[in-house]
Amino acid sequence: MMTRLTCDVVKALGDKTLSVAESCTGGMIGAAITSVPGSSKVFKGGVISYTNEVKSSLLGVSKDLLAREGAVSLPVAQEMAVGVRAATGSDYGLSVTGLAGPGGDEYGNSVGTVFVGYADENGFFARKFLFDGDRESVRLKAVNAALQMLMENL
């Protein structure tokens, strides 16, 4: 899964470190990063937080926030990025939460809705993306969007 973008991200990290928190991508970002030779110098690790329980217990995402906004939301993506950065002591935290299919959620999100979160020493933010395609296509597009967003902020 090594791509030009993934290689560029690893190179751009330099002496900084990255950790990821993934939901709908199920470890695909971590797999992409670790496919690059030398990535062990910059990649600390990842959490596949597929359930709300893991988002809360391992990443510190507020249970109230999860109940109020749903797992697929901008503030949850932000808290995931902040949480994985704090838990691992990384310079950067990157997160993805979304709906790859087959159906939407009770909060009005449709299939293809993905939020990518980013955190560093200066703060955090998240962006919403709407992707089309089947489950695998949405997941691949989410990985690419997350890596692109990271690259733009390195």
Describe each PLM feature range:
Residues 1-154:
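Short alpha-helical segments enriched in small residues
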